[in-house]
Amino acid sequence: MAAGAIALILAILCYFLFSTAHAHEAQSRSKVSPLKEGDTIGVLAPAAKGNMAEYTEAIDLLESLGYQVKLAPSVHKSAGYLAGSDEDRAKDINDFFQDDEVKAILCLRGGYGSARILPLLDYDAIAKHPKLFIGFSDITALHTALGEKAHMVTIHGPMLSSFKNFDYTAFTLYLFENGLSGSYPIGKLPMPEGTSLTTLVPGSATGLLEGGNLTVLASLCGTPYELKGDGAILFLEDVRVSPYEIDRLMEQLYQNGLLSRVSGIVYGDFGRAQAGAAEGDFSVDDIMTHYAKQAGKPAVKNFPIGHAANNLFLPLGIQATLQANEDGTATITLNESYLKSN
């Protein structure tokens, strides 16, 4: 074989090896450490304000699990409907990630405001101090930015507000408690008793778990913080949205290309979305199935995440497999831990 041909083959081989390694590196996320008894959980308010007098029972619950609680200044602040200025709320996040005393960060509540602080976060500094970061709803903006910019695993799960009125199930508390301590089961994700995942579009997919609140993800499209989602298993939830609003938001994700980039779609709780729909209107299931089929992706529904009493402690940025069977049954399996190796 001519020397030129050999050189060309070697060059092509090196290119593919580099590309594969680069793609793997791009997908890898920094993992986090579990909590030990006596560790400190930092509570901050990156979005809407809250009345801390309403959170006494929730703080007592964290302390009953064996943890200390440190409150960020933002939980006591107010600026319109926000928990202080954008600068104040961003500073709390930057400070807590670099505070060695704080071993995990729990968001107070959602609402609105997380997207406003994304340009103010020090992603390089945060990336050097990965730790459990937990929340959902509006916190989706932070999960997405921390995954894309700081390349770290985060947790889509209950916030302090989830525990303030005892409006949660034993399922939610059990997985939250075991998720914090590192006893969370790896393998097939559990479902609340009497419930099951249901196939909308059969098929299988493997990729990073990513996603969150549908409204927030759609609002990030076209910004520097939008979810890339290449090969991901995308999960979605929302609350107080009608079927036509879900349709509009899903169309935005479709036209953005996100639904084409992911490998599978998982629908969580959509909070009574069908209420008020007129006879003959598309159902939520119709809309969910339409977009999954249009994108050519396997899809399931009834995933226990979102604004409901059952809310999984779900690691984002780790490999998982979605299996949606022809008989209507389905499973989601975590293929790796969200925790650092010892």
How should these model regions be labeled?
Residues 5-17:
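Bacterial N-terminal signal peptides
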Residues 225-284:
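Internal helical hairpin/lid segments
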Residues 24-101:
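ATP/NTP phosphate-donor binding region
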Residues 123-145, 153-159:
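Short, acidic/small-residue loops that bind anionic groups at enzyme active sites
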Residues 101, 127-132, 152, 262-263, ...:
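A short helix->loop->beta-strand "cap" motif at the edges of active sites that frequently abuts
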Residues 269-342:
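ATP/nucleoside-binding phosphotransfer catalytic cores, i.e., glycine-rich phosphate-binding loops
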